[in-house]
A protein has these predicted regions:
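A short beta-strand-turn-helix
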Residues: 10-29, 53
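Bacterial Sec-dependent N-terminal signal peptides
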Residues: 1-14, 146, 150
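Conserved redox-active cysteine motifs that mediate thiol-disulfide chemistry
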Residues: 34-48
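Short, internal strand/loop/helix patches
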Residues: 81-114
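Short pre-active-site segment immediately N-terminal to redox-active cysteine/selenocysteine motifs
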Residues: 27-30, 35-38, 70, 113
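Conserved helix-turn-beta segment immediately C-terminal to the redox Cys motif
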Residues: 28, 46-67, 83
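Thiol-based oxidoreductase modules, predominantly thioredoxin-like and allied folds used
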Residues: 60-75, 87-97
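Thiol-/selenol-based redox modules, centered on thioredoxin-like
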Residues: 116-150
Length: 150
Protein backbone atom coordinates (compact mmCIF):
# COMPACT_ATOMS: atom_id res chain seq x y z
CA UNK A 1 0.00 0.00 0.00
CA UNK A 2 1.13 3.55 -0.74
CA UNK A 3 1.37 4.60 2.92
CA UNK A 4 3.73 1.78 3.82
CA UNK A 5 6.05 2.41 0.87
CA UNK A 6 6.89 5.99 1.68
CA UNK A 7 9.14 7.91 3.99
CA UNK A 8 8.08 11.40 5.10
CA UNK A 9 10.64 13.22 2.97
CA UNK A 10 10.17 11.06 -0.12
CA UNK A 11 7.42 12.62 -2.15
CA UNK A 12 6.03 10.36 -4.82
CA UNK A 13 4.27 11.81 -7.85
CA UNK A 14 0.89 10.11 -8.37
CA UNK A 15 -2.12 10.39 -10.66
CA UNK A 16 -5.72 10.43 -9.48
CA UNK A 17 -6.20 6.81 -10.61
CA UNK A 18 -3.50 5.68 -8.18
CA UNK A 19 -4.98 7.75 -5.35
CA UNK A 20 -8.44 6.31 -6.05
CA UNK A 21 -6.95 2.81 -5.85
CA UNK A 22 -5.24 3.60 -2.54
CA UNK A 23 -8.53 4.89 -1.11
CA UNK A 24 -10.52 1.91 -2.38
CA UNK A 25 -8.01 -0.71 -1.22
CA UNK A 26 -7.10 0.75 2.18
CA UNK A 27 -7.36 -1.93 4.84
CA UNK A 28 -6.95 0.64 7.63
CA UNK A 29 -9.06 3.59 8.70
CA UNK A 30 -7.45 6.54 6.96
CA UNK A 31 -7.41 10.31 6.94
CA UNK A 32 -6.42 11.86 3.63
CA UNK A 33 -5.52 15.52 3.91
CA UNK A 34 -5.48 17.59 0.72
CA UNK A 35 -3.16 20.55 1.25
CA UNK A 36 -0.62 22.88 -0.36
CA UNK A 37 2.50 24.66 0.85
CA UNK A 38 0.89 28.09 0.21
CA UNK A 39 -2.26 27.24 2.21
CA UNK A 40 -1.88 28.67 5.72
CA UNK A 41 -4.98 26.92 7.18
CA UNK A 42 -3.65 23.63 5.76
CA UNK A 43 -0.38 24.04 7.63
CA UNK A 44 -2.16 25.19 10.81
CA UNK A 45 -4.21 21.98 11.05
CA UNK A 46 -1.28 19.60 10.46
CA UNK A 47 -0.26 19.36 14.15
CA UNK A 48 -3.80 18.18 14.97
CA UNK A 49 -3.57 15.40 12.39
CA UNK A 50 -0.22 14.22 13.70
CA UNK A 51 -1.45 14.37 17.30
CA UNK A 52 -4.52 12.26 16.51
CA UNK A 53 -2.57 9.72 14.46
CA UNK A 54 -0.28 9.18 17.46
CA UNK A 55 -3.25 8.99 19.83
CA UNK A 56 -5.16 6.41 17.76
CA UNK A 57 -2.20 4.51 16.32
CA UNK A 58 -3.24 1.36 18.20
CA UNK A 59 -6.55 1.47 16.27
CA UNK A 60 -4.67 1.27 12.96
CA UNK A 61 -5.40 4.87 11.95
CA UNK A 62 -3.28 6.11 9.02
CA UNK A 63 -2.67 9.56 7.56
CA UNK A 64 -1.80 10.40 3.96
CA UNK A 65 -0.92 13.97 2.99
CA UNK A 66 -1.78 14.77 -0.63
CA UNK A 67 -0.08 17.92 -1.89
CA UNK A 68 -1.98 19.89 -4.52
CA UNK A 69 0.89 22.30 -5.11
CA UNK A 70 1.74 23.51 -8.60
CA UNK A 71 4.31 21.54 -10.56
CA UNK A 72 7.00 24.16 -9.84
CA UNK A 73 6.84 23.26 -6.14
CA UNK A 74 7.49 19.54 -6.72
CA UNK A 75 9.48 18.22 -4.97
CA UNK A 76 11.86 20.82 -3.47
CA UNK A 77 9.39 23.35 -2.05
CA UNK A 78 7.12 20.62 -0.70
CA UNK A 79 10.07 18.90 1.00
CA UNK A 80 11.28 22.23 2.41
CA UNK A 81 7.90 23.17 3.91
CA UNK A 82 7.34 19.62 5.18
CA UNK A 83 10.64 19.83 7.06
CA UNK A 84 9.90 23.28 8.49
CA UNK A 85 6.52 22.27 9.87
CA UNK A 86 7.78 18.81 10.89
CA UNK A 87 5.44 16.68 8.79
CA UNK A 88 6.12 13.02 9.49
CA UNK A 89 3.24 11.35 7.66
CA UNK A 90 3.63 10.02 4.12
CA UNK A 91 3.32 12.75 1.47
CA UNK A 92 2.38 12.36 -2.17
CA UNK A 93 2.06 15.01 -4.86
CA UNK A 94 -1.04 14.77 -7.04
CA UNK A 95 0.19 15.23 -10.60
CA UNK A 96 -3.07 16.57 -11.99
CA UNK A 97 -3.89 20.05 -13.29
CA UNK A 98 -7.62 19.81 -13.99
CA UNK A 99 -9.55 20.17 -10.73
CA UNK A 100 -12.82 19.67 -12.64
CA UNK A 101 -11.51 16.20 -13.47
CA UNK A 102 -9.97 15.02 -10.20
CA UNK A 103 -12.08 16.71 -7.49
CA UNK A 104 -15.31 14.78 -8.22
CA UNK A 105 -13.33 11.53 -8.14
CA UNK A 106 -12.62 12.24 -4.45
CA UNK A 107 -16.02 13.70 -3.56
CA UNK A 108 -18.85 14.96 -5.77
CA UNK A 109 -19.26 18.06 -3.58
CA UNK A 110 -15.59 19.14 -3.71
CA UNK A 111 -15.05 22.48 -5.45
CA UNK A 112 -11.27 22.21 -5.08
CA UNK A 113 -10.95 24.37 -1.96
CA UNK A 114 -8.17 23.77 0.53
CA UNK A 115 -7.75 22.43 3.09
CA UNK A 116 -9.95 19.43 2.44
CA UNK A 117 -10.02 16.13 4.30
CA UNK A 118 -11.38 12.69 3.51
CA UNK A 119 -12.08 10.21 6.32
CA UNK A 120 -12.49 6.59 5.22
CA UNK A 121 -12.89 3.23 6.88
CA UNK A 122 -13.50 0.60 4.22
CA UNK A 123 -14.18 -2.10 6.82
CA UNK A 124 -17.26 -0.24 8.04
CA UNK A 125 -18.13 1.69 4.88
CA UNK A 126 -17.47 5.00 6.64
CA UNK A 127 -16.71 7.92 4.33
CA UNK A 128 -16.90 11.62 5.19
CA UNK A 129 -15.48 14.61 3.31
CA UNK A 130 -14.75 18.11 4.65
CA UNK A 131 -13.91 21.07 2.44
CA UNK A 132 -12.64 23.36 5.17
CA UNK A 133 -10.15 23.53 7.99
CA UNK A 134 -10.83 20.92 10.68
CA UNK A 135 -10.56 21.97 14.33
CA UNK A 136 -8.91 19.66 16.85
CA UNK A 137 -12.32 18.97 18.43
CA UNK A 138 -14.05 18.16 15.13
CA UNK A 139 -11.11 16.06 14.00
CA UNK A 140 -11.27 13.89 17.10
CA UNK A 141 -15.06 13.66 16.87
CA UNK A 142 -14.77 12.49 13.24
CA UNK A 143 -12.04 9.98 14.10
CA UNK A 144 -14.14 8.51 16.92
CA UNK A 145 -17.11 8.17 14.56
CA UNK A 146 -14.92 6.56 11.90
CA UNK A 147 -13.50 4.10 14.46
CA UNK A 148 -16.89 3.41 16.10
CA UNK A 149 -15.66 4.75 19.46
CA UNK A 150 -18.64 6.95 20.33
Amino acid sequence: MLCNMMQAQEIKKIKIVELEKTIKESSHPMIISFWATYCVPCLEEMPYFHEMIAKYKDKGLKLLLVSLDLQEAYPKQIISVAGKVKLTAPIVWLDETDADYFCPKIDSSWSGGLPSTLFINNKTGYRRFYEDEVSRENLEKEIKAMLNLQ
